[in-house]
A protein has these predicted regions:
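Disordered, low-complexity "stalk" and linker segments at domain junctions of extracellular
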Residues: 2-30, 35-40, 45, 54, ...
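Beta-sheet repeat architectures centered on beta-propellers
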Residues: 2-104, 148, 158-160, 173-178, ...
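Surface-exposed loop/turn positions within WD40 beta-propeller blades
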Residues: 97, 105-106, 264, 272-273, ...
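Beta-strand initiation motifs
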Residues: 162, 211-213, 239-241, 283-286, ...
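Surface loop/turn motifs at the tips and blade-to-blade linkers of beta-strand repeat domains
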Residues: 222-223, 290-294, 331-336, 381-382, ...
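WD40 beta-propeller blade core
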Residues: 276, 317-318, 360, 472
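Loop/turn segments within WD40 beta-propeller blades
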Residues: 302-304, 344-348
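Surface-exposed extracellular loop regions of Gram-negative outer-membrane beta-barrel proteins
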Residues: 308-333
C-alpha cells in the first residue's frame, strides 16, 4: 500500500532540503500556529486603541486607577513616533506619584505622572539640575570664637526628587554671627515648564571631633519666591539632629538612547559605548562615577533574572551587582554583534537578539545561535534585512516582523515552483520561532499591512502591534479567530511513479459556516477567507494537479487520473484548524490508512 498520512504538523527547517525533511515538517509555512501538533492559524489581531498621532509607531499602556492592570481593554495609551523609545514605570514600590519614564535616540530622557499623562499634560526632563551658586555674609556677632563652615543648596522637585549640591560657599565668622544666605535663583523654565522644581534646600557643614565634615539640612524654602534670603542662626547642636545631605553626586542622566529596569530598583541606560546606572529606587539620580565605558558601541539592553545583558556592535556583555556603585561586567566569548535594538527580547530562558549569524540567546554566561539548526547564514541575512527586526514574546515563541523577508514566488498562478528571492515589502512579513518546542520550529508570518512595531505589553505580557493607525492585540485565549495560513508539506517520494486516487482532510468538528457559493474544484482558484474554510492543493513532480475546496471534516476528494508521478506535495491554505490528512492510491487503501 502506498499512502501519505499527516497526523501531525510541524514547522519549517529551511536548512534541510525539502526532500529530506521529516514527514511532519513543512517546506513552507506562513501564519501557522503549530503548538498542539494540529494545523492551526495565528490569532486575528484584535483592535485595542486608535492612535491619536497618525505618525506614531509605538504605544505603551498605563492602567486606569482601580482597574486590573492585566485587562487589555482599559488603560491610557502613550504614543511615540520613534520606534526605539523605551518606556518604564517607576522602580519604586507603590509609587504615590505613579511616575513613568521614557527616552529614545531622538529625545532626551523624560518623565511624567500618570495623572498628568491622562490629562494630556507635558512631561519633564528627567533628573534634577545642579543648583546655582549661593552667597553668604555675616553680621552681629560679638564672640571672639571663630567658626568656618560651608554652605550648599539643592533643588527639589514636586515629587521629592533632590538634585546634586551647588558649589560650596566657604565662610568664616564669629560663632554668634548671623549668617545671611542668598539662595540661588531658579531658571523660570524649571518651575513647571521643562522641570518641576518646587523647593530649595540649604545645607551647612559640621566638623566632628574626628575631623569629618558633614552637611546637614538647615532649611527648605519655596523655589517660586523670586529672591531667596535666609538668616542662619542655628547652633551646631540643633543642626546635628537634622537630616544629612545624600544627593551630592545625584546628577541628571545624559542623553540616554535607551534604558531598562534592573533588579533592586536600579535603572540601566546607555549612550554610545557608555553604560550608566541610576541610584537604586531613584531613577532621577545618575552619578557619573557609576558609569562604565565598554569596548563596543551599545545597541540595546535586556534582562535575565538578576543579570543585565548588554547587546553591542561586538561581543555581548553581561553586568550584575546589587549596588550601582559596584556593578561588574563580563565580556562573552562569542563575537555576535547585535543588529537592532528592536530585536532584543527578554525572556525567562534568556535574552534574544538578532546578529548577522542568526538569532542569539544569551543566558548563564554564554551566547548561543539558536537558529543555526534551522536557517543557513545566507537565508538569515535576507530574513534579518540588515537588522530591521522588531520582536516580542508570543507565548514561548520569538515573534518578529522585519523590513524585508524572503518571499517565495512562482512562475504560475500558485506556489508550484518556489523561487526564493529577497523582496523589500516593508514590515508586512516576519517570522516566528520557538527553540524550546521542536514541533513549532520556524514559520513565516504575514499581515495584510505594514506592522510598525511589536512589543510586549508591560502590564500583561501580551503581544501588541501597531498597524494601520491602531494598536492591536494577539489574543491567544481559547476560542480566538484565526488568520488565514499556508502550510506546504515536504516532498514525499514514492518507491516508483504512482497515481494517487483520493484524499481526506479531517477538521476539528464541522464548523458552522455559511458557504455563499457552490463548492469550488477549479485548479486555478485562489483562497477566499470570506467565503471558504480551506483549500487543499496537490502537486505531482512539482506540478499543480489539484486544488479543491474542503467544507466538511473527512469528506472524500478524488484526484485526476491519466498520469503518474514519484514526488508529491500537499499544501493547505485555510482559516480552520486541521486535525490530519490522508491520501492513498485507491479508495480501498484510503479506508485502511
Amino acid at each position: 500500500m502506498v499512502a501519505i498520512k499527516l497526523p501531525i504538523f510541524s514547522g519549517m527547517v529551511p536548512s534541510i532540503d525539502k526532500h529530506l525533511l521529516a514527514d511532519p515538517n513543512a517546506q513552507y509555512s506562513n501564519n501557522a500556529w503549530l503548538y498542539s501538533g494540529a494545523l492551526d492559524g495565528l490569532p486575528v489581531k484584535e483592535p485595542l486603541h486608535t492612535l491619536v498621532n497618525p505618525n506614531a509607531t509605538v504605544a505603551f499602556r498605563i492602567p486606569l486607577p482601580g482597574n486590573d492592570p492585566s485587562y487589555m481593554y482599559t488603560g491610557t495609551w502613550v504614543e511615540f513616533e520613534n520606534i526605539l523609545t523605551d518606556f518604564i514605570s517607576a522602580p519604586v514600590a507603590a509609587d504615590s506619584f505613579d511616575r513613568y519614564y521614557w527616552t529614545s535616540t531622538t529625545t532626551e530622557p523624560q518623565y511624567n505622572t500618570a495623572d498628568r499623562i491622562r490629562l494630556g499634560q507635558h512631561g519633564f526632563r528627567l533628573g534634577i539640575p545642579q543648583a546655582g551658586d549661593l552667597n553668604v555674609t555675616v553680621s552681629g556677632g560679638v564672640s571672639a570664637t571663630l567658626v568656618s563652615r560651608a554652605y550648599v543648596a539643592t533643588l527639589v522637585s514636586e515629587y521629592g526628587e533632590e538634585g546634586p549640591s551647588s558649589n560650596p560657599f566657604l565662610i568664616t565668622g564669629k560663632i554668634d554671627d548671623t549668617f545671611h544666605v542668598t539662595l540661588p535663583a531658579v531658571d523660570p523654565d524649571w518651575l513647571g515648564v521643562t522641570r518641576n522644581i518646587k523647593k530649595i534646600r540649604l545645607y551647612r557643614t559640621i566638623v566632628s571631633a574626628q575631623g569629618t565634615t558633614t552637611y546637614y539640612l538647615v532649611t527648605e524654602v519655596n523655589a517660586l519666591v523670586t529672591t531667596q534670603l535666609y538668616d542662619d542662626t542655628m547652633t551646631d547642636a540643633v543642626l546635628a539632629s537634622k537630616p544629612l545631605l545624600e544627593s551630592t553626586a545625584w546628577t541628571e542622566p545624559p542623553d540616554l538612547d535607551g534604558f531598562i529596569v534592573m533588579p533592586n530598583g536600579i535603572v540601566a541606560g546607555f549612550m554610545d559605548n557608555e553604560l550608566w546606572f541610576s541610584e537604586a529606587y531613584r531613577p532621577h539620580a545618575w552619578p557619573a562615577a557609576y558609569s562604565l565605558t565598554l569596548e563596543f558601541k551599545i545597541v540595546g539592553l535586556g534582562i535575565i533574572n538578576q543579570t543585565l545583558v548588554v547587546c553591542t556592535e561586538g561581543n555581548p556583555i553581561t553586568a550584575s551587582g546589587v549596588n550601582p556603585a559596584s556593578i561588574t561586567t563580563s565580556k562573552l566569548a562569542a563575537f555576535e554583534p547585535c543588529l537592532s535594538k528592536g530585536s532584543i527580547v527578554s525572556t525567562e530562558e534568556g535574552v534574544f537578539y538578532a546578529s548577522p549569524n542568526g538569532l542569539i540567546l544569551v543566558n548563564a554566561g554564554y551566547a548561543q545561535n539558536i537558529t543555526k539548526q534551522y536557517i543557513s547564514k545566507d537565508l538569515w541575512a535576507s530574513i534579518a534585512n540588515e537588522g530591521k527586526i522588531n520582536a516580542g514574546r508570543l507565548g514561548s515563541a520569538y515573534y518578529a516582523f522585519t523590513g524585508g523577508v524572503p518571499k517565495f514566488v512562482q512562475d504560475g498562478v500558485f506556489q508550484s515552483n518556489f523561487v526564493q528571492t529577497e523582496i523589500s515589502i516593508g514590515s508586512a512579513e516576519g517570522f516566528l520561532i520557538d527553540p524550546s518546542n521542536q514541533n513549532v520550529g520556524f514559520t513565516f508570518t504575514k499581515d495584510t499591512m505594514d506592522i510598525k512595531s511589536v512589543k510586549n505589553d508591560a502590564l500583561s505580557g501580551e503581544v501588541i502591534v501597531v498597524r494601520d493607525g491602531k494598536v492591536l492585540w494577539l489574543d491567544l485565549r481559547p476560542g480566538y479567530d484565526i488568520e488565514p495560513y499556508v502550510w506546504r508539506s515536504k516532498v514525499f517520494q514514492t518507491p516508483f511513479a504512482k497515481n494517487f486516487a483520493a484524499y481526506k482532510t479531517y477538521l476539528y468538528g464541522n464548523p458552522s459556516f455559511i458557504f455563499p457559493n457552490p463548492q469550488n474544484y477549479n485548479i486555478n482558484q485562489q483562497f477566499d477567507p470570506a467565503t471558504q474554510l480551506a483549500i487543499v492543493r496537490v502537486y505531482a513532480d512539482g506540478r499543480l494537479v489539484s486544488a479543491q475546496e474542503v467544507r466538511q471534516s473527512g469528506e472524500l476528494h478524488r484526484l485526476p487520473t491519466g498520469f503518474k508521478a514519484q514526488f508529491w506535495e500537499i499544501e493547505f491554505e485555510a482559516k480552520v484548524k486541521i486535525k490530519s490528512f490522508q491520501m492513498a492510491t485507491s479508495m480501498k487503501e484510503l479506508a485502511l490508512v
